């Protein structure tokens, strides 16, 4: 069954390129991006993992840990790293899970629970549903789920934008409008009364419609 926003991210133990982890312990009190790819040594995935490595400093600045996953063995992940660096200029600098028994992929709803066997002999097409992004909060709750098709590489700048929004709205009773970026105006949520808003934003707010109150982004 697919995970939904607000669900507790399932816990698991796994072998990674940086050793064995217990997922919830590994999360600690951090935000986390768990992202999966269909298969090692494939073209789109090569660009994705290299791009994620290039952007890792941006995730670090936000206090976000990143971890990759595929059903390939950890040894394959390690061998593939040189190719990724050759193509993109950056090798994975984050742990990558080897989900060879498919258990985590099934636990997170990326493969049907009825899927049998192991990763051996599986093709990228067999794993076509395993190109997901899960953003998980420090409370271990799922905050966002993205599922991409085989032929479309992910936009990790958008993942960073969503994290900026999630972290801001976790601290302040605001929401972010379409295409919002860090530093731009935000919208007060309905939970904030006008009397409260006057105290929080004495300079006032813009009201293009009675149900829309636009204010400057609060300081984090």
Regions found by a protein language model. Give the residues of each.
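Chalcogenol-based redox active-site neighborhoods
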Residues: 1-220
């Amino acid at each position: 069954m697919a995970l939904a926003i607000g669900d507790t991210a399932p816990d698991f133990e796994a072998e990674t390129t940086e050793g064995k982890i217990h997922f919830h312990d590994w999360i600690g009190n951090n935000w986390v991006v768990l992202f999966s790819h269909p298969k090692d040594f494939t073209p789109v995935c090569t660009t994705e993992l290299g791009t994620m490595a290039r952007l890792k400093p941006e995730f670090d600045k936000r206090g976000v840990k990143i971890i990759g996953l595929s059903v390939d063995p950890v040894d394959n992940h390690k061998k593939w790293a040189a190719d990724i660096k050759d193509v993109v200029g950056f090798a994975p600098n984050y742990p990558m899970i080897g989900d060879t028994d498919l258990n985590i992929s099934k636990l997170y709803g990326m493969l049907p629970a009825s899927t049998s066997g192991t990763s051996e002999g599986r093709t990228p097409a067999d794993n076509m549903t395993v190109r997901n992004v899960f953003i998980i909060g420090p409370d271990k709750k799922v905050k966002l789920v993205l599922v991409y098709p085989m032929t479309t590489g992910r936009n990790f700048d958008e993942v960073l934008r969503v994290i900026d929004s999630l972290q801001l709205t976790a601290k302040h009773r605001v929401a972010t409008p379409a295409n919002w970026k860090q530093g731009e105006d935000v919208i007060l949520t309905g939970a904030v009364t006008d009397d409260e808003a006057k105290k929080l934003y004495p300079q006032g707010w813009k009201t293009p419609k009675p149900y829309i109150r636009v204010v400057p982004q609060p300081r984090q």
